[in-house]
Amino acid sequence: MKLEEESLENMRNNIGLLTFHKSINYGSVLQAWALTKTISKKYSVEVIDYKPNKYDYLYGLYRPWNTMNNIKYNLKRIPLRKEIKNQAYLFERFREKQLSLSPIEYNSKNADKIGNFYDVIVVGSDQVWNLRAKDCDLVFFLPFSFAGRKVSYACSINDTDYTEERCSDELRKQLCSFDFISIREKSGSEKLQNYIFNKKKVYTLLDPTLLCDKEDYKSLVTDRIVKENYVFLYNVWTSEAGIQAAKYISEILHMPVYTIMTASNIKEIKMLEKNGILVEKTKTSPSDFLNFFKYASYVVTESFHGTAFSLIFERPFVCVSKRTNDERLVNILELVGLKNRYIKLSEISGFDLTKPIDYVRVNEKKRAKARECIEVLYQAIEGERKS
C-alpha cells in the first residue's frame, strides 16, 4: 500500500532511480533491476515509482474506442485479452518483488514532490531522453526544485536530433542543471554535448544490463520452461528478417523455434505461428524472458537487449536485420569483438553457425568495461565528476 506524502516529510532516501520501469517491455524492466542492483552494492537506492500520464493509453488493455485507428488496434487485441492481462499482471508482480519501489506513486500531479525525498536522483537508463519515444516526458529531465545531485546514467536519445528547431531553451537549461551526464550511444553523447554548447562533458557508458554478470541474474531465472533444445527468436517487433533467419537456423540445427509474446496483437502472433514458430503466451514474466535466453541452444535477434542477454548468458547468437548500422548493436558488438555476428538476412546462408564464440575473451572485455562504468557511476553519485 502506498503511503501518504505527509507521513514521509521527514524521511530521505539516499538515491532515487527514475526510469521506464512501468512499461511492459522486458529490456526496460530488467535494465531498471540491473541499475538498482549495481547502485545497491554501495548505496541505499529505490526506484521512483513514477507513472507517466500516457501509460494507461500505451499499456492498457484497450485504447479509447474513439478513432478508427484505435478501433483497429483494439480489435487485434481482443483475441489475446487474457494473455495481455496476464502479462501485465506478471510484470507488476516482478516489479513489486524485485524492484525496491518508492512508497509514493508519482504522476504528473505530484511529480514536483519527487525531489523532497532524495539526496541524489539518477535518471536512466533506457530511452528516457529520446524525445520521439512514446514513454518520454519532461519529468525525466527533472524540471522541479531539487537541492541534491542530478545524475544521468546511460540515457539513450536514440535517433533524436537535439537541435534549436526541436528543443527549447528550457530543455537545455534542465540538461545543464545535471551534475553528471552520460549517454548510452557515442553519437548521442556527441549530439547532446553540442546541444549544451560543451558546457559539460557527456560520457558514453554501458547499458545497465551489462553491468551485471550471469551470476547476478541467476536468482531471477525460473525453472526451465522448454525441455527440448530450441532456437530462441527475440525481437521487440515482429520482423520478417528475424523469422526467416530463425527458420533457416532451425532447419540447419534440427530444432524448433520458440519466442515469447511481445507483439500483443493477433495479426503478428498469427504471422509467427504461420511460420512454424512456437509463441509462449502464458509464461511471459521478465524472469521467464531470461529463462528463454539461459536455456536456448541458439538465439536470433535484432534487439539491443536480445543481444545483451545473449552475451550475458553466453549463448551462440546472431543479429539479423535488413540493415547492419544500428549503432546500439554495433557499439556493444565491437566492444566484445563480435561485430561479425551482425549480418543481413541475405548473408545468413554463408554464415558459419557452428563457429564457437570465445566467451572467455568476450567476458574479459565486457567485465573490464563494466568495472570502468561502475566506477564512473559511483564517482558521479559521490560528486567527484562535475565537469
Task: Please report, for each region that a protein language model flagged, where it lies by residue.
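Active-site anion-handling motifs in enzyme catalytic cores
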Residues: 3-387
